[in-house]
Protein backbone atom coordinates (compact mmCIF):
# COMPACT_ATOMS: atom_id res chain seq x y z
CA UNK A 1 0.00 0.00 0.00
CA UNK A 2 1.30 3.45 -0.93
CA UNK A 3 0.89 6.74 0.90
CA UNK A 4 0.53 10.21 -0.57
CA UNK A 5 3.38 12.68 -0.15
CA UNK A 6 1.46 14.76 2.41
CA UNK A 7 0.77 11.63 4.50
CA UNK A 8 4.43 10.64 4.39
CA UNK A 9 5.46 14.10 5.54
CA UNK A 10 3.00 13.91 8.43
CA UNK A 11 4.81 10.76 9.59
CA UNK A 12 8.20 12.42 9.07
CA UNK A 13 7.10 15.35 11.27
CA UNK A 14 6.00 12.95 14.02
CA UNK A 15 9.56 11.62 14.12
CA UNK A 16 11.05 15.10 14.34
CA UNK A 17 12.35 15.22 10.77
CA UNK A 18 12.62 18.56 8.92
CA UNK A 19 9.74 19.02 6.45
CA UNK A 20 8.11 22.05 4.84
CA UNK A 21 5.11 23.67 6.47
CA UNK A 22 2.14 22.67 4.36
CA UNK A 23 -1.53 21.77 4.13
CA UNK A 24 -3.37 19.17 2.05
CA UNK A 25 -6.50 20.81 0.66
CA UNK A 26 -9.68 19.61 -1.06
CA UNK A 27 -10.94 22.82 -2.70
CA UNK A 28 -9.48 25.85 -4.54
CA UNK A 29 -10.66 28.12 -1.71
CA UNK A 30 -8.74 26.03 0.83
CA UNK A 31 -5.62 26.31 -1.37
CA UNK A 32 -5.79 30.11 -1.14
CA UNK A 33 -6.39 29.92 2.63
CA UNK A 34 -3.38 27.60 3.00
CA UNK A 35 -1.14 30.26 1.45
CA UNK A 36 -2.27 32.73 4.13
CA UNK A 37 -1.65 30.20 6.91
CA UNK A 38 1.84 29.38 5.64
CA UNK A 39 2.83 32.98 4.99
CA UNK A 40 5.53 34.26 2.64
CA UNK A 41 5.27 35.29 -1.00
CA UNK A 42 5.95 32.01 -2.82
CA UNK A 43 4.49 28.54 -2.42
CA UNK A 44 4.76 25.14 -4.06
CA UNK A 45 1.53 23.38 -5.05
CA UNK A 46 1.55 19.65 -5.76
CA UNK A 47 -1.14 17.33 -7.09
CA UNK A 48 -1.35 14.27 -4.81
CA UNK A 49 -1.29 10.96 -6.69
CA UNK A 50 0.46 7.62 -6.16
CA UNK A 51 2.91 8.14 -9.02
CA UNK A 52 6.23 9.77 -9.78
CA UNK A 53 6.95 12.17 -12.61
CA UNK A 54 4.38 14.71 -11.43
CA UNK A 55 6.60 17.71 -12.16
CA UNK A 56 7.10 16.89 -15.85
CA UNK A 57 3.35 16.25 -16.19
CA UNK A 58 2.47 19.69 -14.79
CA UNK A 59 1.39 18.36 -11.40
CA UNK A 60 3.90 20.46 -9.42
CA UNK A 61 4.17 24.24 -9.71
CA UNK A 62 5.78 27.22 -8.01
CA UNK A 63 3.18 29.96 -7.49
CA UNK A 64 3.63 33.57 -6.43
CA UNK A 65 0.06 34.49 -5.55
CA UNK A 66 -2.98 33.01 -3.82
CA UNK A 67 -4.88 33.37 -7.08
CA UNK A 68 -2.34 31.15 -8.87
CA UNK A 69 -2.60 28.53 -6.11
CA UNK A 70 -6.39 28.62 -6.41
CA UNK A 71 -6.18 28.32 -10.21
CA UNK A 72 -3.85 25.31 -9.93
CA UNK A 73 -6.30 23.58 -7.58
CA UNK A 74 -9.17 24.34 -9.96
CA UNK A 75 -7.12 22.90 -12.82
CA UNK A 76 -6.37 19.56 -11.14
CA UNK A 77 -8.94 18.69 -8.46
CA UNK A 78 -11.32 16.09 -9.83
CA UNK A 79 -9.11 15.51 -12.89
CA UNK A 80 -6.68 12.71 -13.72
CA UNK A 81 -2.92 13.29 -13.80
CA UNK A 82 -1.06 11.24 -16.41
CA UNK A 83 2.67 10.65 -15.79
CA UNK A 84 5.22 8.17 -17.12
CA UNK A 85 4.40 5.94 -14.11
CA UNK A 86 0.63 5.80 -14.71
CA UNK A 87 -1.41 4.19 -17.46
CA UNK A 88 -3.01 6.25 -20.23
CA UNK A 89 -5.95 7.14 -17.96
CA UNK A 90 -3.74 8.55 -15.20
CA UNK A 91 -4.56 8.82 -11.49
CA UNK A 92 -7.39 10.94 -10.01
CA UNK A 93 -6.40 14.03 -8.03
CA UNK A 94 -8.52 14.59 -4.92
CA UNK A 95 -6.04 16.60 -2.83
CA UNK A 96 -3.50 19.35 -3.45
CA UNK A 97 -0.52 19.87 -1.16
CA UNK A 98 0.29 23.55 -0.63
CA UNK A 99 3.60 24.14 1.13
CA UNK A 100 6.25 26.75 1.78
CA UNK A 101 8.96 27.39 -0.80
CA UNK A 102 12.47 26.04 -0.09
CA UNK A 103 15.71 27.69 -1.25
CA UNK A 104 17.73 24.75 -2.55
CA UNK A 105 21.52 24.68 -2.75
CA UNK A 106 22.05 20.96 -3.46
CA UNK A 107 19.93 17.82 -3.88
CA UNK A 108 20.77 14.44 -2.33
CA UNK A 109 19.00 11.09 -2.22
CA UNK A 110 18.20 8.95 0.83
CA UNK A 111 16.05 5.83 0.78
CA UNK A 112 15.56 2.42 2.34
CA UNK A 113 14.21 -0.94 1.18
CA UNK A 114 13.95 -4.47 2.53
CA UNK A 115 16.77 -6.41 0.87
CA UNK A 116 15.51 -9.99 0.55
CA UNK A 117 18.93 -11.50 -0.12
CA UNK A 118 20.46 -10.20 3.13
CA UNK A 119 17.09 -10.17 4.99
CA UNK A 120 17.92 -6.71 6.28
CA UNK A 121 16.75 -3.14 5.84
CA UNK A 122 19.27 -1.46 3.55
CA UNK A 123 19.66 2.32 3.36
CA UNK A 124 20.90 3.90 0.15
CA UNK A 125 22.25 7.41 -0.24
CA UNK A 126 23.60 9.34 -3.20
CA UNK A 127 24.80 12.77 -4.21
CA UNK A 128 22.55 12.37 -7.29
CA UNK A 129 19.27 13.54 -5.77
CA UNK A 130 16.12 14.71 -7.51
CA UNK A 131 16.47 12.22 -10.38
CA UNK A 132 15.37 8.63 -11.02
CA UNK A 133 17.54 6.61 -8.61
CA UNK A 134 17.11 3.43 -10.68
CA UNK A 135 18.82 5.22 -13.59
CA UNK A 136 21.66 6.33 -11.30
CA UNK A 137 22.09 2.76 -10.03
CA UNK A 138 22.21 1.48 -13.62
CA UNK A 139 24.48 4.14 -15.15
CA UNK A 140 26.76 5.01 -12.21
CA UNK A 141 26.40 2.33 -9.50
CA UNK A 142 29.49 3.68 -7.72
CA UNK A 143 27.44 6.74 -6.73
CA UNK A 144 25.05 4.64 -4.61
CA UNK A 145 26.19 4.38 -0.99
CA UNK A 146 24.73 1.69 1.26
CA UNK A 147 24.26 0.95 4.97
CA UNK A 148 22.78 -2.33 6.19
CA UNK A 149 20.71 -2.22 9.40
CA UNK A 150 21.17 -4.99 11.96
CA UNK A 151 17.63 -5.91 13.12
CA UNK A 152 18.86 -6.70 16.64
CA UNK A 153 20.28 -3.24 17.37
CA UNK A 154 18.65 -1.02 14.73
CA UNK A 155 20.26 1.88 12.89
CA UNK A 156 23.34 3.22 14.67
CA UNK A 157 24.47 6.86 14.63
CA UNK A 158 27.94 5.87 13.38
CA UNK A 159 26.32 4.49 10.20
CA UNK A 160 24.63 7.84 9.60
CA UNK A 161 27.90 9.70 10.17
CA UNK A 162 29.71 7.35 7.78
CA UNK A 163 27.17 8.03 5.01
CA UNK A 164 27.30 11.78 5.74
CA UNK A 165 31.10 11.83 5.34
CA UNK A 166 30.82 9.95 2.04
CA UNK A 167 28.20 12.43 0.80
CA UNK A 168 30.62 15.27 1.49
CA UNK A 169 28.60 16.82 4.33
CA UNK A 170 30.39 18.97 6.88
CA UNK A 171 29.98 20.33 10.39
CA UNK A 172 26.41 20.50 11.68
CA UNK A 173 25.13 18.87 8.48
CA UNK A 174 26.62 15.56 9.64
CA UNK A 175 24.67 15.77 12.89
CA UNK A 176 21.47 16.67 11.02
CA UNK A 177 21.91 13.82 8.52
CA UNK A 178 22.51 11.32 11.32
CA UNK A 179 19.32 12.49 13.04
CA UNK A 180 17.35 12.05 9.79
CA UNK A 181 18.94 8.64 9.11
CA UNK A 182 18.16 7.24 12.57
CA UNK A 183 14.64 8.72 12.52
CA UNK A 184 13.81 7.22 9.13
CA UNK A 185 15.14 3.82 10.22
CA UNK A 186 12.91 3.88 13.32
CA UNK A 187 9.92 4.96 11.19
CA UNK A 188 10.65 2.13 8.73
CA UNK A 189 10.66 -0.51 11.47
CA UNK A 190 7.80 0.91 13.55
CA UNK A 191 5.40 0.99 10.60
CA UNK A 192 6.46 -2.19 8.74
CA UNK A 193 7.47 -0.33 5.61
CA UNK A 194 8.63 -1.99 2.40
CA UNK A 195 10.14 1.14 0.84
CA UNK A 196 10.93 4.67 1.94
CA UNK A 197 12.44 7.48 -0.14
CA UNK A 198 13.39 11.09 0.40
CA UNK A 199 14.14 12.28 -3.10
CA UNK A 200 15.38 14.88 -2.90
CA UNK A 201 16.87 15.37 0.54
CA UNK A 202 18.11 18.92 0.04
CA UNK A 203 20.77 21.16 1.48
CA UNK A 204 19.14 24.59 1.76
CA UNK A 205 20.90 27.88 1.04
CA UNK A 206 21.34 28.33 4.82
CA UNK A 207 23.22 24.98 4.97
CA UNK A 208 20.51 22.98 6.77
CA UNK A 209 19.14 19.65 5.55
CA UNK A 210 15.48 19.35 4.58
CA UNK A 211 13.18 16.49 3.48
CA UNK A 212 11.60 17.91 0.33
CA UNK A 213 9.67 14.79 -0.70
CA UNK A 214 8.32 11.64 0.94
CA UNK A 215 7.59 8.34 -0.75
CA UNK A 216 6.34 5.50 1.47
CA UNK A 217 5.22 1.99 0.61
CA UNK A 218 3.87 -0.27 3.38
CA UNK A 219 4.14 -4.06 3.44
CA UNK A 220 0.50 -5.02 2.79
CA UNK A 221 0.95 -8.22 4.81
CA UNK A 222 1.51 -6.09 7.92
CA UNK A 223 -1.51 -3.81 7.55
CA UNK A 224 -3.53 -5.86 10.05
CA UNK A 225 -1.31 -4.48 12.81
CA UNK A 226 -1.04 -0.94 11.42
CA UNK A 227 -4.56 0.53 11.86
CA UNK A 228 -3.24 4.09 11.61
CA UNK A 229 -1.74 3.45 8.17
CA UNK A 230 -4.75 1.40 7.08
CA UNK A 231 -6.90 4.48 7.71
CA UNK A 232 -4.66 6.46 5.33
CA UNK A 233 -5.50 4.21 2.38
CA UNK A 234 -6.85 6.11 -0.62
CA UNK A 235 -8.98 3.66 -2.65
CA UNK A 236 -9.28 6.15 -5.53
CA UNK A 237 -5.65 5.40 -6.41
CA UNK A 238 -6.22 1.64 -6.72
CA UNK A 239 -6.86 -0.17 -9.98
CA UNK A 240 -10.58 -1.07 -9.82
CA UNK A 241 -9.93 -4.66 -10.90
CA UNK A 242 -7.12 -5.13 -8.39
CA UNK A 243 -9.34 -3.74 -5.61
CA UNK A 244 -12.14 -6.15 -6.60
CA UNK A 245 -9.66 -9.05 -6.58
CA UNK A 246 -8.41 -8.11 -3.14
CA UNK A 247 -11.92 -8.44 -1.69
CA UNK A 248 -12.00 -12.06 -2.88
CA UNK A 249 -8.39 -12.77 -1.83
CA UNK A 250 -7.33 -13.14 -5.44
CA UNK A 251 -3.86 -11.99 -6.46
CA UNK A 252 -4.43 -9.92 -9.60
CA UNK A 253 -2.14 -7.58 -11.51
CA UNK A 254 -3.39 -5.85 -14.66
CA UNK A 255 -1.11 -5.98 -17.72
CA UNK A 256 -1.44 -4.71 -21.29
CA UNK A 257 -2.02 -7.86 -23.39
CA UNK A 258 -5.16 -9.53 -24.73
CA UNK A 259 -5.02 -13.04 -23.20
CA UNK A 260 -6.62 -13.35 -19.77
CA UNK A 261 -4.90 -15.84 -17.45
CA UNK A 262 -6.45 -17.65 -14.47
CA UNK A 263 -4.04 -19.94 -12.62
CA UNK A 264 -3.67 -21.46 -9.15
CA UNK A 265 -0.26 -20.71 -7.67
CA UNK A 266 1.97 -17.69 -8.22
CA UNK A 267 4.85 -19.69 -9.72
CA UNK A 268 2.58 -21.53 -12.14
CA UNK A 269 0.93 -18.22 -13.03
CA UNK A 270 4.28 -16.66 -13.94
CA UNK A 271 5.26 -19.78 -15.90
CA UNK A 272 1.94 -19.64 -17.76
CA UNK A 273 2.51 -16.01 -18.69
CA UNK A 274 6.01 -16.87 -19.91
CA UNK A 275 4.83 -19.70 -22.17
CA UNK A 276 1.98 -17.58 -23.57
CA UNK A 277 4.57 -14.93 -24.41
CA UNK A 278 6.89 -17.58 -25.89
CA UNK A 279 4.18 -18.61 -28.35
CA UNK A 280 3.53 -15.05 -29.48
CA UNK A 281 0.73 -14.06 -27.12
CA UNK A 282 0.53 -11.16 -24.67
CA UNK A 283 -0.93 -11.81 -21.18
CA UNK A 284 -3.60 -9.33 -20.11
CA UNK A 285 -3.07 -10.06 -16.44
CA UNK A 286 -1.48 -12.08 -13.67
CA UNK A 287 -4.20 -13.83 -11.64
CA UNK A 288 -3.55 -16.40 -8.93
CA UNK A 289 -6.78 -17.89 -7.50
CA UNK A 290 -4.77 -19.70 -4.81
CA UNK A 291 -5.36 -23.09 -3.23
CA UNK A 292 -8.93 -22.45 -2.12
CA UNK A 293 -10.39 -22.04 -5.60
CA UNK A 294 -14.16 -22.24 -5.01
CA UNK A 295 -16.85 -21.75 -7.66
CA UNK A 296 -17.54 -18.28 -6.24
CA UNK A 297 -13.90 -17.22 -6.49
CA UNK A 298 -13.56 -18.64 -10.01
CA UNK A 299 -16.70 -16.71 -11.00
CA UNK A 300 -15.31 -13.48 -9.56
CA UNK A 301 -11.98 -14.16 -11.28
CA UNK A 302 -13.79 -14.44 -14.63
CA UNK A 303 -15.65 -11.18 -13.93
CA UNK A 304 -12.38 -9.39 -13.17
CA UNK A 305 -10.59 -10.75 -16.25
CA UNK A 306 -13.50 -9.96 -18.58
CA UNK A 307 -13.91 -6.43 -17.21
CA UNK A 308 -10.79 -5.70 -19.30
CA UNK A 309 -12.13 -4.90 -22.78
CA UNK A 310 -8.78 -5.86 -24.33
CA UNK A 311 -9.22 -9.56 -23.43
CA UNK A 312 -9.87 -11.66 -26.55
CA UNK A 313 -9.39 -15.13 -24.99
CA UNK A 314 -8.95 -16.68 -21.54
CA UNK A 315 -6.51 -19.40 -20.49
CA UNK A 316 -7.36 -21.35 -17.32
CA UNK A 317 -4.39 -23.40 -16.11
CA UNK A 318 -5.04 -25.44 -12.96
CA UNK A 319 -2.78 -27.93 -11.22
CA UNK A 320 -4.91 -29.99 -8.85
CA UNK A 321 -3.10 -30.55 -5.60
CA UNK A 322 -5.03 -29.17 -2.66
CA UNK A 323 -7.94 -28.39 -4.95
CA UNK A 324 -9.66 -31.08 -7.09
CA UNK A 325 -9.79 -30.54 -10.86
CA UNK A 326 -13.40 -31.77 -11.12
CA UNK A 327 -14.47 -29.14 -8.60
CA UNK A 328 -12.60 -26.47 -10.57
CA UNK A 329 -14.26 -27.71 -13.78
CA UNK A 330 -17.69 -27.30 -12.18
CA UNK A 331 -16.68 -23.83 -11.03
CA UNK A 332 -15.55 -22.89 -14.55
CA UNK A 333 -18.82 -24.15 -16.06
CA UNK A 334 -20.89 -22.28 -13.46
CA UNK A 335 -18.84 -19.13 -13.96
CA UNK A 336 -19.07 -19.26 -17.77
CA UNK A 337 -22.86 -19.64 -17.53
CA UNK A 338 -23.30 -16.91 -14.90
CA UNK A 339 -20.95 -14.35 -16.40
CA UNK A 340 -21.95 -15.06 -19.98
CA UNK A 341 -18.42 -15.42 -21.33
CA UNK A 342 -18.34 -14.41 -25.00
CA UNK A 343 -14.62 -14.98 -25.67
CA UNK A 344 -12.93 -18.38 -26.21
CA UNK A 345 -11.89 -20.19 -23.01
CA UNK A 346 -8.98 -22.66 -23.09
CA UNK A 347 -8.66 -24.94 -20.06
CA UNK A 348 -5.71 -27.09 -19.05
CA UNK A 349 -6.23 -29.33 -16.00
CA UNK A 350 -3.50 -31.47 -14.45
CA UNK A 351 -3.19 -33.42 -11.20
CA UNK A 352 -5.88 -34.40 -8.68
CA UNK A 353 -8.97 -35.72 -10.59
CA UNK A 354 -7.76 -34.12 -13.85
CA UNK A 355 -9.42 -36.79 -16.05
CA UNK A 356 -12.74 -36.38 -14.24
CA UNK A 357 -12.44 -32.61 -14.61
CA UNK A 358 -11.83 -32.93 -18.36
CA UNK A 359 -14.88 -35.21 -18.64
CA UNK A 360 -17.07 -32.70 -16.77
CA UNK A 361 -15.95 -29.94 -19.17
CA UNK A 362 -16.50 -32.14 -22.25
CA UNK A 363 -20.06 -32.99 -21.17
CA UNK A 364 -20.97 -29.39 -20.34
CA UNK A 365 -21.96 -28.51 -23.90
CA UNK A 366 -20.19 -25.15 -23.56
CA UNK A 367 -17.62 -23.74 -25.98
CA UNK A 368 -14.64 -24.58 -23.78
CA UNK A 369 -11.43 -25.73 -25.47
CA UNK A 370 -9.69 -28.54 -23.56
CA UNK A 371 -5.88 -28.54 -23.80
CA UNK A 372 -3.72 -31.65 -23.44
CA UNK A 373 -0.59 -29.88 -22.16
CA UNK A 374 0.65 -26.44 -21.18
CA UNK A 375 2.29 -25.97 -24.59
CA UNK A 376 -0.93 -27.00 -26.31
CA UNK A 377 -2.90 -24.63 -24.07
CA UNK A 378 -0.63 -21.70 -24.94
CA UNK A 379 -0.82 -22.44 -28.68
CA UNK A 380 -4.61 -22.83 -28.56
CA UNK A 381 -5.23 -19.61 -26.63
CA UNK A 382 -2.91 -17.57 -28.87
CA UNK A 383 -4.79 -18.84 -31.94
CA UNK A 384 -8.13 -18.12 -30.27
CA UNK A 385 -7.06 -14.57 -29.37
CA UNK A 386 -6.06 -13.99 -33.00
CA UNK A 387 -9.48 -15.24 -34.15
CA UNK A 388 -8.06 -18.32 -35.89
From Swiss-Prot:
GO terms for molecular function: ATP binding; magnesium ion binding; nucleoside diphosphate kinase activity; succinate-CoA ligase (ADP-forming) activity; succinate-CoA ligase (GDP-forming) activity. GO terms for biological process: nucleoside triphosphate biosynthetic process; succinyl-CoA metabolic process; tricarboxylic acid cycle. Succinyl-CoA synthetase functions in the citric acid cycle (TCA), coupling the hydrolysis of succinyl-CoA to the synthesis of either ATP or GTP and thus represents the only step of substrate-level phosphorylation in the TCA. The beta subunit provides nucleotide specificity of the enzyme and binds the substrate succinate, while the binding sites for coenzyme A and phosphate are found in the alpha subunit. Can also generate UTP or CTP, although it preferentially synthesizes ATP and/or GTP. The lineage of its organism: Bacteria, Pseudomonadati, Pseudomonadota, Gammaproteobacteria, Pseudomonadales. Heterotetramer of two alpha and two beta subunits. This is Succinate--CoA ligase [ADP-forming] subunit beta. Signal peptide: none annotated. Substrate binds at residues 264, 321-323. The keyword Cell division does not apply. Pathway: Carbohydrate metabolism; tricarboxylic acid cycle; succinate from succinyl-CoA (ligase route): step 1/1. Its cofactor is Mg(2+). Its EC number is 6.2.1.5. Transmembrane segments: none annotated. Belongs to the succinate/malate CoA ligase beta subunit family.
Amino acid sequence: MNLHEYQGKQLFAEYGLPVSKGFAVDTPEEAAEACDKIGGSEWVVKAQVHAGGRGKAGGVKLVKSKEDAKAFAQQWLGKNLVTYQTDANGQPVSKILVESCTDIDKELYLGAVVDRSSRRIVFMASTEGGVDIEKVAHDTPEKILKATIDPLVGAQPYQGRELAFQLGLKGDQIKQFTHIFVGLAKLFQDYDLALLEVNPLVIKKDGNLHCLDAKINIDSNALYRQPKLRAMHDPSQDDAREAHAQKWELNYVALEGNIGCMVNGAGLAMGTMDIVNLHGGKPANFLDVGGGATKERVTEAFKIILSDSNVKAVLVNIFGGIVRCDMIAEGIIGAVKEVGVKVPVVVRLEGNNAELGAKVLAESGLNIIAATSLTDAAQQVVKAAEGK
